[in-house]
Swiss-Prot record:
Entries under SUPFAM superfamilies matching the protein: alpha/beta-Hydrolases
Function of the molecule: Ensures normal bone formation, through the negative regulation of bone morphogenetic protein (BMP) signaling in osteoblast lineage cells by blocking cytoplasm-nucleus translocation of phosphorylated SMAD proteins.
GO CC annotation terms, alphabetical: nuclear membrane; nuclear outer membrane
Primary localisation category: nucleus
Protein name: Transmembrane protein 53-A
Topology term for the membrane: Single-pass membrane protein
GO BP, sorted A to Z: negative regulation of BMP signaling pathway; negative regulation of ossification; negative regulation of osteoblast differentiation; regulation of nucleocytoplasmic transport
Species for this entry: Xenopus laevis
Gene3D superfamilies given in the database record: alpha/beta hydrolase
Keyword Amino-acid biosynthesis set for record: no
Length: 285
């Protein structure tokens, strides 16, 4: 089912761990969505934050070619990955657990866009119990320079300079034409992820971790998304780390980062549990 051709990692909490405030039958599941070009071991330090809290952790990163090429062409290439990822929760029989997403950069954000659409439209995926989402260095809105920098980081380790230059130039031209110049027309066929998520109907809390020093994702794009949610009175928390670079907030501020993620996780699960109890046992007068 969900694990067919999906390159993911899942870690279950240690049975010996005691003292966590979770229902032992419904321990939280945290799903990490890596940035474009991310390796599984890069996510290990983030996974440890939640694993040490007694959570089940799933790590998945979409293929960089899908993130930078097919999605730029307006093809919904990540939608099937999103569906398979959510189906894993049923495969492992943890579909009743509270779920938190931790989304990195636009690579994770693109995949999350399809996840949200499926959660609101596809049965039985719409039965899953999402309680919160954390965004790290996301989202960005049609930032050509930032996208080129991100792709350059990926290609730098595996291609020569001449090929990399040609690939980056072709990518930049493609994005400028399809996602900027022709976007007033192409958006009717494939709305970009940023615009689509500005209308996200999800009411669970969201936490945005970003930095004004990020050279790839503009803090103005992040703050515009934050403002859009707050105008709709949706629960939104933020932290501007100020000096850290792209997806480097944990590396620069490990204690602060861990504390806010842990606090957000616990708060989301607690509020969701209270809400569920009230719905199951309504007070009558």
């Amino acid at each position: 089912m969900g694990d067919s051709e999906l390159d993911y990692t899942i870690e279950f909490p240690e049975p010996s761990l005691q003292g966590w405030p979770w229902d032992p039958e419904r321990e939280p599941v945290v799903i990490l969505l890596g940035w474009g070009g991310c390796k599984d071991h890069y996510l290990a330090k983030y996974s440890a934050i939640y694993h040490n809290q007694g959570c089940t952790v799933i790590k998945y990163t979409a293929a960089w070619k899908a993130v930078f090429i097919t999605e730029s062409l307006g093809l919904n290439s990540l939608r099937e990955d999103a569906k398979k990822l959510l189906e894993l929760l049923f495969d492992y029989e943890i579909e009743k657990s509270p779920i938190v997403f931790h989304v990195f950069s636009n690579g994770g954000f693109m995949l999350y866009r399809y996840i949200v659409e499926l959660l609101h439209s596809h049965c039985p995926l719409n039965k899953l119990h999402v309680v919160g989402t954390i965004f790290d260095s996301a989202p960005g809105n049609r930032n050509v320079i930032g996208s080129v920098r991100a792709l350059d980081t990926i290609l730098r380790t595996s291609t020569n300079k001449a090929f990399r230059f040609l690939a980056l130039a072709a990518f930049a031209i493609l994005v400028i034409i399809l996602r900027i110049l022709l976007y007033p027309l192409t958006r009717f066929l494939h709305e970009n992820h940023y615009d689509a998520m500005k209308k996200d109907p999800s009411r669970w809390p969201q936490l945005y971790l970003y930095s004004r020093a990020d050279p790839i994702i503009s803090y103005l794009d992040v703050e515009s998304m934050i403002a859009a949610r707050r105008r709709r009175c949706l629960p939104t928390e933020t932290l501007d780390f100020g000096k850290s670079e792209h997806v480097s907030h944990f590396r620069r501020f490990p204690q602060r980062y861990s504390e806010i993620c842990t606090s957000f996780l616990r708060d989301c699960v607690r509020k969701a549990s209270i809400s569920m109890l009230r719905s199951e046992h309504p007070v009558s007068f």
